[in-house]
Amino acid sequence: MKPSELPHRAGVGFKPEHFSAIDAAAQPVGFFEVHAENYMGAGGPPHAKLSKLRQDYALSIHGVGLSIGSMQPLDTDHLARLKIVCDRYEPESFSEHLAWSTHDTTFLNDLLPLPYTEMTLTQVCAHIDQVQTLLDRQMLLENPATYLLFEQSTIEETDFLAEIVRRTGCGLLLDVNNVFVASTNHHMDPRDYLSRFPVEWVREIHLSGHSETVDDAGAPLLIDSHDTAIKDPVWALYEELIARTGPIASLVEWDNDVPEWPVLRAEAEAAGAILRRAADRRAA
């Protein structure tokens, strides 16, 4: 099984509207990430641009539609299309979410949470084994942004993720914004969560912006919206994390209200500066 092996640099999510600016620059970022489902067609401009990009950059393919956390079988047609994409581009990394988005023949346009129980643990592990066997590559599993908790849960999320890694050999994608969003929504301490997270298995980090609102009781409610710059509390958590772990491949996500390329590149440069400082401290 091919391991995940992105460079320990800062990358960004690739947006086709940025292609010309990227093509004119000299290695502006460490790697790019794309959503697998956007490249499941056979050809056309998306593939032409990504093929050109792939000649010069490391690539992470990030899935959003496998429904790893579903209690029903994985969609084998979707899996087959995913394999075609991965075989075509040979990415340095493939990742998916600890979430579900299908029910019978209904496909939901969201990543929904699941209770953490022995039953769901067994099902998620079986699904990951199926994916990794088909792709012959290690999959990274991303911690979710959540807006509710389940009374049925009997396992802490960090323990749930650690046990998945132990059983399947997958790696983890640690989304720092998701940690901050979920911790705020559930009135928990994000630093306590990160202190318990199995960081030794993290092969990629995600950073993104979130939107702020209030719930019906007037309490703060954060939405993992990917439509703004990374907020200061998330940067602070990230810098503390990297000081502890050392450099890890780190991706800036900005999927909605996408800015001009220089704005996105500046976010990646800020992450890259944190990575370099951590590397320098370790080398000293």
Swiss-Prot record:
Q: Which PANTHER family match?
A: UPF0276 PROTEIN HI_1600 (PTHR42194:SF1)
The family database entries (NCBIfam families) matched by this protein are listed as:
PRK05409.1
Family classification: Belongs to the UPF0276 family.
Report what the protein is called. UPF0276 protein Arad_4857
Q: Which InterPro entries match?
A: MbnB/TglH/ChrH (IPR007801), Xyl_isomerase-like_sf (IPR036237)
Any matching Pfam family: MbnB_TglH_ChrH
HAMAP family reported in the protein's UniProt record: UPF0276
Gene3D superfamilies recorded for this chain?
Divalent-metal-dependent TIM barrel enzymes
